[in-house]
Structure formats: C-alpha cells, structure tokens
Amino acid sequence: MLAVYLHGFILSAAMILPLGPQNVFVMNQGIKRQHHLMSASLCALSDIILICAGIFGGSALLSRSPLLLALVTWGGVAFLMWYGWGALMAAWRGDGVASSATSVTQGRWRILVTLLAVTWLNPHVYLDTFVVLGSLGGQLLPDIRPWFALGAVTASIVWFFALAFLAAWLSPWLNRPVAQRIINLFVGGVMGFIAFQLARQGFGL
C-alpha cells in the first residue's frame, strides 16, 4: 500500500511543480497576503475533485469527447490572455495591493472567480488529472486504487499550502512597489506564454 501511495504522491508532485496558472496565482496572493490560504484551499479542493474523478472513471469521458477538450482549451486561451493582459496593465500603472475594506471584500469574490477559472479553464489540469493520473490509476486493482488517489491528493495539498505560506513569508521583501511591478510583468508573461502554447495545441501545430 505504501508503495502505491508514494507512486501517486511522486507522480502528482512531478506534474504540480512546473510553473502554471494555479501556482502563479497562489504565489501572487501569498505575496500580497490577500486570501492566500483560501486560494490554496480552493486549488487543493479542485485538485481533489479532479484527481478522484480522473482516477475513478472520468478519464474515459475526456478521451471520448474531443469537442469538450476543444471548448476547455479555447476557453482557457481566452481567459489566460485576459488575465495576463490585466497583469501587464497593472505593471504598467504600478498598481499596489488594495487597502480599503471595500476593496478587500470585492477582492475576495474576484479572487474566488478568478481562481476557479484558472483551475477549471486550464486544459493542462484535465490532461494531468484525467489522462495521466486517471489512466495510471485506472489500471490498478480496485482495492489499492484509493491509496494511489490519496497519494496524489496529498501531494497537491502539501504543495499549494507550502507555496502560499512561503510566498507570505517572503511578502515583506516581495510586496514592495518595484517588486510588485516585476511580479506583474512575470505573471503577465507566464500567462501569455501558456495561452500561446494552448493555442498551438488547439490548432494542432
């Protein structure tokens, strides 16, 4: 059982660690110390749902529906371009962290919607959880499959909360105006690059 658990943990960690929209978003919220634990919780919860769905049968749905994958891909491209453009504009204007209570309240809902979009409109999430984890986990015997899923879920939870806490710890150094401008440029560049890669996949290039 332990070997199966570790297999799921290591495989999931290997797919989560590369820089992606979720990691960038959680890192940015941690640096701002603005609902970063909520962001980590939502990312982990979304991963739990997707990982379990993929391992326990959802992978077949995605593999049999090219139209669904295309819709998710182009929805993701549009969203990432919009989000990346917003980050670049924030860097250009030198926007800082909202300080008023009203702004924080509005920010909570905006963070919630944005994070759900970053997660659920990202085709790579479905490929990782449904295709890779789902295919491998689906080949295991039913009695040990939950251990594989538990290992994969554990890696996701550990990673997102570690990222949020680390970013918050570094916040005093990274939350300065110059650093925020650099981070916004970085976020905009990453989102634009991922959108470009997704568009290439969508066109089959």
UniProtKB/Swiss-Prot annotation:
Topology relative to the membrane: Multi-pass membrane protein
One GO cellular component term of this record is: plasma membrane
Instruction: From the UniProt record, list the reaction(s) this protein catalyses.
Output: L-arginine(in) = L-arginine(out)
Q: Does the keyword Ribonucleoprotein apply?
A: no
From the Swiss-Prot or TrEMBL record, state where the protein is found: Cell inner membrane
Q: Which domain of life is it from?
A: Bacteria
Indicate where this protein is primarily found: membrane
The UniProt keywords, alphabetically, are: Amino-acid transport, Cell inner membrane, Cell membrane, Membrane, Transmembrane, Transmembrane helix, Transport
Question: So where does this one cross the membrane?
Answer: 1-21, 42-62, 67-87, 111-131, 147-167, 185-205
Q: Which InterPro entries match?
A: Arg_export_ArgO_enterobac (IPR023445), LeuE-type (IPR001123), Lys/arg_exporter (IPR004777)
In alphabetical order, the GO MF annotations are: L-arginine transmembrane transporter activity
The entry sums up its family as follows: Belongs to the LysE/ArgO transporter (TC 2.A.75) family.
Role: Involved in the export of arginine. Important to control the intracellular level of arginine and the correct balance between arginine and lysine.
**PANTHER family recorded for this chain?**
ARGININE EXPORTER PROTEIN ARGO, ARGININE EXPORTER PROTEIN ARGO-RELATED
Q: What is this protein called?
A: Arginine exporter protein ArgO
